[in-house]
Each structure stands twice: as structure tokens, then as C-alpha cells.
């Protein structure tokens, strides 16, 4: 997460109403403790800023600087209850690799957390790597591994309204486990699709963000914006 684009994206999220900002990973670039200390300052806001690790992150430093916890190597999973909606921020990282996986501990945590909710409490699940192909060789080489395990788990939890991910550096929408799958836009550089030219990275695009609106019918509507 580069500092100035991150500040601009967070400022763009300061809207009136019941607001929380999920950040699906890559809080740091190199996993250095100093990067997280800077990020902690930027991510301080008058509304909840929810984070999970990405493939560039280091769990011990993430825990210490952003959560105030003792450093540890286990998955960094958190649950947040925001004005009637439960948001599960899940750790899908495999240390040292771009691909992701929700390991047995995390899948069990997701199941236990959702089981504890009433069926009329809507939930969102967020993690780093998309569980489906986005039809670009770069993000598709670093997808979530074994996504069928999560899909099977979600069959027992109809209160999950949508799945939110990042990682791809391009805003995208698809479906997963009969639910909306929303991929957040890039804060730093934007991925160019194969039909947009030979250069894979467009570093001139401004940072982006997505506004998610979850209504009383559990319908998720997403509006994408760039921050100029």
C-alpha cells in the first residue's frame, strides 16, 4: 500500500452513514514493521477500517502494528459487527506465495462464526485472492486454491450475502457459490486486460474504491469510483 494513494482512497470513503472500510490485504509492500507503523497512522479513521493480510504482508508485524496483538504466525482472522451486518475478514495468505488458501483453521473459524449468528443476520466474507478466474493470466496465476471447500461451507450458511476480495488490481464482479463476488479496485497501479494493450500495469490510473450498499433484502449493490 503506497502512502499517498492509500490516504486518498481512505478519504474517499468518508461518507455519511453507517460506514466501514474493508481492506483486503497488501497493507505493506515488503512486510516490514515500519510499513505497518505508517499504515496504522493512515488507517486511523472515525469509522472502522477492517483489514486482513495479503500476499505481501507478514502476519507478526500485521498483528502487532494494526491489531495491538502479540506477534504470531497463525492466521489473522477477525469478525466485526457493523450496524446489523457481520463482516468476516479472513486470512487466505500462504507465506511466501502469491496464491491463497483458506486453511483448515480458517475454514473452521468461518463455520463456527457463521453458525453463531442468527439466520436473519446478514454477513459478508472478505479475503485476499479471488476464488474464480478473472480471465487475465496474472491474477489467475495467484487465485485462491481449493475454492470448493469454501463453496461447500457456504451452502450451510444462507445469511452470507456476498464475498469480497482484492489482489487483482482491477475492479471486477463475478459470482461464487451462488453469491456476488466483488473484487476491489487498485489503490496503487491498475491491471490492463489483455485487450487493452501490451503493458500489464497502468501506473497512471488514480486509486479506486468501491462503495458497497447492503439493503434490507440482503441485496448488495456496489458503486466503483476513482479518487482524483
Question: Can you annotate each of these PLM segments?
Answer:
Residues 1-38, 134:
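N-terminal active-site segment of His-dependent metallophosphoesterases
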Residues 8-20, 100-180, 208-211, 218-220:
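His/acidic metal-ligating clusters that form di-metal
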Residues 84-94, 124-128, 179-185, 223-225:
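Active-site-proximal beta-strand elements of phosphoester/diester hydrolases
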Residues 32-119, 149, 155-159, 177, ...:
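Extended active-site neighborhood of metal-dependent phosphoesterases/phosphodiesterases
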Residues 92-93, 135-139, 193-196:
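Short acidic, glycine/proline-rich loop/turn micro-motifs
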Residues 25-27, 55-56, 92-93, 129-130, ...:
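Active-site metal-binding loops of divalent metal-dependent hydrolases
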Residues 153, 175-228:
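Binuclear metal-dependent phosphoesterase catalytic core
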Amino acid at each position: 500500500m503506497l502512502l499517498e494513494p492509500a490516504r486518498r482512497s481512505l478519504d474517499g470513503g468518508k461518507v455519511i452513514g453507517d460506514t466501514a472500510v474493508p481492506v483486503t490485504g497488501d497493507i505493506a509492500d515488503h512486510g516490514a514493521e515500519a510499513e505497518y507503523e505508517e499504515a496504522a497512522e493512515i488507517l486511523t479513521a472515525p469509522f472502522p477500517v477492517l483489514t486482513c493480510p495479503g500476499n505481501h504482508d507478514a502476519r507478526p508485524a500485521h498483528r502487532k502494528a494494526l491489531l495491538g496483538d502479540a506477534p504470531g504466525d497463525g492466521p489473522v482472522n477477525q469478525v466485526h459487527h457493523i450496524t446489523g451486518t457481520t463482516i468476516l475478514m479472513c486470512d487466505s495468505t500462504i507465506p511466501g506465495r502469491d496464491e491463497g488458501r483458506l486453511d483448515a483453521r480458517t475454514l473452521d473459524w468461518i463455520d463456527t462464526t457463521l453458525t453463531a449468528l442468527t439466520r436473519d443476520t446478514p454477513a459478508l466474507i472478505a479475503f485476499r485472492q479471488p476464488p474464480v478466474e478473472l480471465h487475465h493470466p496474472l491474477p489467475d496465476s495467484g487465485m485462491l486454491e481449493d475454492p470448493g471447500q469454501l463453496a461447500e461451507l457456504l451452502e450451510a450458511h444462507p445469511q452470507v450475502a456476498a464475498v469480497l476480495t482484492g489482489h487483482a488490481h482491477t475492479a471486477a464482479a463475478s459470482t461464487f457459490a451462488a453469491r456476488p463476488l466483488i473484487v476491489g479496485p487498485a489503490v496503487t497501479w491498475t491491471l490492463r486486460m489483455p485487450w487493452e494493450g501490451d503493458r500489464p500495469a497502468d501506473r497512471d490510473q488514480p486509486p479506486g474504491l468501491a462503495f458497497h450498499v447492503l439493503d434490507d433484502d440482503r441485496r448488495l449493490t456496489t458503486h466503483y469510483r476513482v479518487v482524483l
